[in-house]
Design a protein with these regions (language model features):
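Catalytic machinery of carbohydrate-active enzymes
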Residues: 1-354
Length: 354
C-alpha cells in the first residue's frame, strides 16, 4: 500500500467513524429530549413519529398522510422526521406538532430502538432509507413483507398509496381512504417574496431538470420549446429550479433558478397559468397548488408507464401527461411535445371559457 493510499484510507475512516459517533450522540440527545417532553404529556397522550425524510416531491405527495394520521390519533403529539433541507414543507403543517431535522438514518435507528415513540409510521423502504457516510441501509419490515422496493413500488399505486402501504396504514393495492389531494401551507413571507418578483400577469412556469437524469428531457429541446412558446403564445416563460441549463435568449423568458426557497417556488407556481415540467418535485408543488400541469414523462426503470400523483393530477383533472408508451422522457421528440402542449393549452383555454 502506498503512503497516499494509506492516507486516503484513514482519512475516509476518520470521517466515517466521526460521523457515526456524532449520529450516536445525537440519537441519545434526541432520546432525552423526547423522554422529557413525553413526561409532560397528559395521561394517555401518545408520541407518534412519521418518517419521510426526502425528496421534497415525495414529502409533498405524502402530505395527506399527516391529516389521516391526525384523524387516527387526534390527541397525539405527532413528529415528522425529515432532512433539514426540507423542513419548511413540514414546519407550517397544522397536523404536525414538531418537525425533527434528521442527521442520518443511524441516528433515527438508535432513537427508535429506545422505544420512546408509541407508534412509528415509516413512509420509506430500504432502498431510499440510506446513509452514504455510515454506508448503511435502514430496512422497513412492513415494506419488505409487502414486496415494496425501488424496483417494484409503482406496482403498488401512486406515491401516496405506496407510502401509506409502507406504513401499514392501508392494505396492499387499495386506494387511500381519505382526502388524497396534497396541500401546501404557504405563509405571508412566501407571498411577499413572490410579490417582490413583479411577475407578469400571464406566465408559464417551466422546470427542466429533475434529480434523476433518466427523467429529464434534453436542454436543447427545452430551448426549442421556449422559442416556440414565445413565438406562438403571449405568455411569459419563468424557469424555476436549482440551476438552469438553457441557453435561450428569448425576451419573454426569465430565469429564477437558485433564487427561491421551496415554498417561495410553490407560490410562484401557484400564480402561474400553467406549469410545464417533469416528474419531479416542482410538479408535486403544482399539483398541491392547483396549477394546471403539462408533465413530460417516460418509462422509468421497470415501469413502462406510471402515475406518481394523487389528487387532481392523479385523476388528470388539471394535468396532461406527455408521454409515449415504452419511451424514456429523453426520447420524446420536440415536435411530439409541442403538439401535446398545444393541445393542452387549447383544451385548458376552452375549459376556462365555459
Amino acid at each position: 500500500m502506498t503512503i497516499e493510499r494509506f492516507r486516503q484510507l484513514w482519512t475516509h475512516r476518520y470521517f466515517k467513524y466521526s460521523h457515526i459517533l456524532k449520529a450516536h450522540l445525537l440519537a441519545y440527545q434526541a432520546w432525552i429530549y423526547f423522554k422529557k417532553k413525553k413526561a409532560k404529556f397528559a395521561p394517555g397522550q401518545e408520541l407518534i413519529a412519521i418518517v419521510r425524510t426526502e425528496h421534497f416531491g415525495d414529502i409533498v405527495a405524502a402530505e395527506p398522510i399527516s391529516r389521516y394520521v391526525r384523524s387516527l390519533h387526534p390527541n397525539a403529539f405527532i413528529v415528522w422526521f425529515v432532512k433539514p433541507s426540507y423542513h419548511e414543507l413540514i414546519d407550517f403543517n397544522p397536523s404536525i406538532d414538531e418537525t425533527f431535522g434528521e442527521f442520518c438514518v443511524t441516528q433515527r435507528r438508535i432513537l427508535f430502538e429506545k422505544n420512546v415513540f408509541d407508534k412509528v409510521y415509516p413512509l420509506q423502504f430500504s432502498n431510499n432509507n440510506h446513509c452514504a457516510k455510515c454506508q448503511v441501509f435502514l430496512d422497513n419490515p412492513i415494506a419488505d413483507r409487502k414486496g415494496i422496493n425501488v424496483h417494484t413500488y409503482f406496482n403498488f399505486g401512486n406515491l401516496l398509496e405506496v407510502f401509506a402501504q409502507t406504513a401499514d396504514l392501508i392494505n396492499s393495492r387499495t386506494p387511500f381512504p381519505a382526502d388524497d389531494q396534497p396541500r401546501l401551507y404557504l405563509q405571508d413571507q412566501h407571498r411577499q417574496k413572490a410579490d417582490s418578483l413583479h411577475l407578469p400577469e400571464n406566465f408559464i412556469v417551466i422546470h427542466c431538470q429533475s434529480n434523476y437524469a433518466p427523467k429529464d428531457w434534453p436542454a436543447a429541446r427545452w430551448d426549442q420549446l421556449v422559442q416556440w412558446l414565445s413565438e406562438n403564445y403571449s405568455y411569459h416563460i419563468v424557469e424555476i429550479g436549482l440551476k438552469s441549463n438553457l441557453t435561450t435568449k428569448e425576451s419573454s423568458y426569465r430565469n429564477l433558478c437558485g433564487q427561491l426557497s421551496i415554498l417561495e417556488t410553490a407560490e410562484v407556481i401557484r400564480r402561474a397559468d400553467f406549469f410545464i415540467g417533469l416528474d419531479s418535485g416542482p410538479s408535486h408543488l403544482a399539483n398541491a397548488g392547483g396549477t394546471t400541469g403539462i408533465i413530460l414523462m417516460g418509462s422509468l426503470g421497470a415501469f413502462p408507464s406510471y402515475n406518481p400523483y394523487s389528487g387532481s393530477y392523479g385523476r388528470q383533472e388539471n394535468a396532461f401527461f406527455v408521454r409515449q408508451e415504452g419511451k424514456m422522457c429523453s426520447e420524446l421528440s420536440c415536435e411530439f411535445v409541442k403538439e401535446k402542449v398545444a393541445n393542452a393549452l387549447e383544451t385548458s383555454a376552452l375549459t376556462k371559457g365555459e
